[in-house]
Amino acid sequence: MDRIALMDASGRDWSAWPAPAKLNLFLQITGRRADGYHLLQTVFRLLDWGDTVHLRVRRDGQIRRLGESLPGVSEDDDLVTRAARLLQSAAGTQAGAEIRVDKRIPAGGGFGGGSSDAATVLVALNALWGLGLAADVLAELGLQLGADVPVFVRGRNAWAEGVGEQLTPISLPEAAYLLVDPGVHVPTPALFRSQELTRDAALAKIADFASGSLLDNAFEPVLRRREPAVEAVFQALSRVGTPRLTGSGSGCFVEFATRAAAEQALAQLPGSLRAWVVEGAAHSPLLDALDATQV
């Protein structure tokens, strides 16, 4: 607990921590476990763009969220609050925290905003509370909150299997991405129940992805048939490149070799679309923020 006292004494009040978005560069479902969870294969690409989580240590043990991370989500149900309380319980610490999130990542778009925010809370409070828990421990805690949380805890681009928690770090080339949020949200369980969803894809290898033969997302045909807004975005993006879906949607993206090319493509899209140009990250900016606290 000495680190908390030092930080308070030094006048460091609120601290800001990045929570990057992600893309699934492909996604296929290969089967189902006995407990009903689906098995998948995917590649997680971290981005240089996302939310910012602001944290302030409390001495009274309370975990409080200030404002609304997501409209309509209660403080107790919010992943950032749950992450902080889970870490507090697992570590047996009496420290508390106040949490505020500046949201940029669209909710329900498959860009990983909620999972990334939760991971950032775990990693940052582990440092701010002086707990010293290993990344493996934090990733295991994160898995209790969501299958995507561990990749954000570890902060590396990764080939993922299992329910998404079996991670193999991989190197990805520099790239820029044109992102579009169609503005619709279909709950993932409803998509998994769809009769159109392919659930028995053949197991692939990392070499298959490296060869460029894996680009499809199993949820794409389901969403394009089900949601006219998603189909409209795919049609618009197909004029500037090869559109893909991230996660279970509804977010869409096109990959480009350079930011300039992505910006040029953005200029050709209808102004009514909610779109961004971002770049892929070699690793999570959260790791850089963590390193800065240890200097």
UniProtKB/Swiss-Prot annotation:
GO BP annotations listed: isopentenyl diphosphate biosynthetic process, methylerythritol 4-phosphate pathway; terpenoid biosynthetic process
GO MF annotations in UniProt: 4-(cytidine 5'-diphospho)-2-C-methyl-D-erythritol kinase activity; ATP binding
Pathway field: Isoprenoid biosynthesis; isopentenyl diphosphate biosynthesis via DXP pathway; isopentenyl diphosphate from 1-deoxy-D-xylulose 5-phosphate: step 3/6
Keywords, ordered alphabetically: ATP-binding, Isoprene biosynthesis, Kinase, Nucleotide-binding, Transferase
A Pfam family of this chain: GHMP_kinases_N
EC number: 2.7.1.148
Alphabetical list of SUPFAM superfamilies matching this protein: GHMP Kinase, C-terminal domain, Ribosomal protein S5 domain 2-like
Catalytic activity: 4-CDP-2-C-methyl-D-erythritol + ATP = 4-CDP-2-C-methyl-D-erythritol 2-phosphate + ADP + H(+)
Superkingdom in the source lineage: Bacteria
Annotated ATP binding sites: P106, A107, G108, G109, G110, F111, G112, G113, G114, S115, S116
Active site per the UniProt annotation: K22, D148
InterPro entries: GHMP_kinase_C_dom, GHMP_kinase_C_sf, GHMP_kinase_N_dom, IspE, Ribosomal_Su5_D2-typ_SF, Ribsml_uS5_D2-typ_fold_subgr
Entry annotated with the keyword Lipid biosynthesis: no
Task of the protein: Catalyzes the phosphorylation of the position 2 hydroxy group of 4-diphosphocytidyl-2C-methyl-D-erythritol.
NCBIfam families in the cross-refs: ispE
Protein name as annotated: 4-diphosphocytidyl-2-C-methyl-D-erythritol kinase
The organism of origin for this protein: Xanthomonas euvesicatoria pv. vesicatoria (strain 85-10)
